[in-house]
């Protein structure tokens, strides 16, 4: 009579459902449906767990066979130096108990010319003896002869390694960032905008002074032209370059305001630009002296000086306004790119916030949750919009203040 077969053990199910394990999320382990699958109204399925460890499959490694027709021919191995008559077979035929004096004696058939082709045997920098003075050690001698028995470099060509660098990507460096940084250095506070006196005059607040506006205006024109050239380059879509360009434009507008009010932007003074402007205006107003301005070859002085000075600066602001159009387009493009990057980053963080690590997730084991590494984005989505708003607000304030100077003069 056959005994009944033992009951078959029920297979062990995984602790995490298939949906949570595939998404690498922590499962609530509720059966028949976990909280996540129940919330998403998805089928919750617990698969049979598998034993941890490596699975030995029936895969066999295939060793590629090389047919004799496709096998490369071996290079001929030559142990003879190019210009010498010494053969390694002669060395092997030498008795082991060869004496050192007999080895170097010229009576054994070797001449000075034969050994001159092997200078490594008589290297004076090596202080240790090559051979024992009583008997010749075969292995020490073979090691000492390894240098002159090397293959000539002409028999085996050196492989070309330059082909490995052909696939590397190369970046196009147009030098726009360097130009903008040079402009920023040129406009640094260490080079203040001074009220330059008329040639032959002293800049004295008590006896009168003169303003040389032409160099400031010409320099600002050159800077704005350089910025316009950089904006025409495709590299101007870079956020870091755009940020530096905006700083340069702000500096140029500050120089226009300083020229209109005869302010001095000195790095030694930590006060704001508005305080400097007010002090300079009050200084020239309190003196009550006549001031002259040089515009090209024209000299304007007397009561019309303040009006002319502010009017000239006001007429130059159209250059900044024309530059703002191209700069705004670049800022809009950079803002859209930053917004897309933020959306993509947020979606990745939403998926990876509860991610689990380790091989135990696929085996149904409890694995501690790992900390998601948040990537640092260089710019916020609203950063470039704020830059554009600040530039337009600064230009509007400069235009209004300069217009007010013209009216009051």
Curated annotation (Swiss-Prot):
Cell location: Nucleus
GO cellular component: nucleus
Keywords: DNA-binding, Metal-binding, Nucleus, Transcription, Transcription regulation
Residues of the DNA-binding region: 17-44
Induction (UniProt): The expression of the dibenzodioxocinones biosynthesis cluster is positively regulated by the transcription factor dibT.
Domain of life of the source: Eukaryota
Biological process annotations from GO: aflatoxin biosynthetic process
Compositionally biased residues, Basic residues: 51-62
Pfam families hit by this protein: AflR, Zn_clus
Annotated spans, Disordered: 49-83
Transmembrane region(s): none
Molecular-function GO terms, alphabetical: DNA binding; DNA-binding transcription factor activity, RNA polymerase II-specific; zinc ion binding
Purpose: Transcriptional regulator; part of the gene cluster that mediates the biosynthesis of dibenzodioxocinones such as pestalotiollide B, a novel class of inhibitors against cholesterol ester transfer protein (CEPT).
Protein name per the record: Transcriptional regulator GME11370
Species of origin: Pestalotiopsis microspora
Taxon lineage: Eukaryota, Fungi, Dikarya, Ascomycota, Pezizomycotina
